């Protein structure tokens, strides 16, 4: 991976990273394609309509179904899905933690029960990389020990001990495999844990920065803490994360979360929010969210967002989308998802432009003013 910082504005950064499949300009939002597909969209939608440069897929789900071995037979995720730009794959640790009724982390990995058929499985730092080698993702995430917040100091200390040990194993395993021509075009990111405990986060960050990771992620946030705790944790952590590697905040978040964390120096984001909200009738606009289910939109001939030029806004009215949603017409899910993802991708594009011009503070002020939040 080639990575360079193009411009900074305060702590906000505009960077460029190059993988084997695409050039990615940051700040970047990654649409979530858990099963190798962003719900209701296909590769043409992602490339030609949204111009997405990178999407996220999930190791846990693809490991269970159709299995990573099947995906490998198609040439990895790129051949399987026909999305020929970059993929980032999560390690699956979060899903093993959150979806399994029986999830038991120990010193060597995580034992969990499949949410599909109840079968038992075991993830280790090496096995999740083996699965991701099969998937041929451009960026692979290591296995980490996630803790729901709030948590005791003892549990957080155990989490970072495991996470650091697993990171060492994963880093050395990937380095060894690349010497055998395995995963030579794949990059590996470490994950910093520690809850909202400053000392734990600092310890974990410093340990992982000593390792040969291509990028560093902040995990274990947006799992029960307040927004203020999230922002404070990210801000306190940034001085300890190597500035010459991409910084990825996992599973975050709202448009406001993106703006706040870009301001603090984060480069990469992912979240199911734009597509999940779209399917439930909540659409993002420059002036805040609207609920397209509302009777107020039945005869509304305006587009979703007066400032939006996405495919949906360029062709269809609020009234039409209101009708599609109430009729449970499947077309609604695609049109709403296209709009919400365009909104997110355009938001990070606007932030990049503001950083490049040295006007991030002005951008942030206008962003909140439009929402009536100043």
UniProtKB/Swiss-Prot annotation:
Pathway: tRNA modification; tRNA-queuosine biosynthesis. It is an enzyme of class 2 (transferase). Its EC number is 2.4.2.29. Substrate binds at residues 90-94, 144, 193, 220. GO terms for biological process: queuosine biosynthetic process; tRNA-guanine transglycosylation. Binds 1 zinc ion per subunit. Signal peptide: none annotated. GO terms for cellular component: cytosol. The keyword Transferase applies. It catalyses: 7-aminomethyl-7-carbaguanine + guanosine(34) in tRNA = 7-aminomethyl-7-carbaguanosine(34) in tRNA + guanine. Pfam families: TGT (PF01702). Zn(2+) binds at residues 308, 310, 313, 339. Homodimer. Within each dimer, one monomer is responsible for RNA recognition and catalysis, while the other monomer binds to the replacement base PreQ1. Belongs to the queuine tRNA-ribosyltransferase family. Catalyzes the base-exchange of a guanine (G) residue with the queuine precursor 7-aminomethyl-7-deazaguanine (PreQ1) at position 34 (anticodon wobble position) in tRNAs with GU(N) anticodons (tRNA-Asp, -Asn, -His and -Tyr). Catalysis occurs through a double-displacement mechanism. The nucleophile active site attacks the C1' of nucleotide 34 to detach the guanine base from the RNA, forming a covalent enzyme-RNA intermediate. The proton acceptor active site deprotonates the incoming PreQ1, allowing a nucleophilic attack on the C1' of the ribose to form the product. This is Queuine tRNA-ribosyltransferase. It comes from Campylobacter fetus subsp. fetus (strain 82-40). The lineage of its organism: Bacteria, Pseudomonadati, Campylobacterota, Epsilonproteobacteria, Campylobacterales. The gene is tgt.
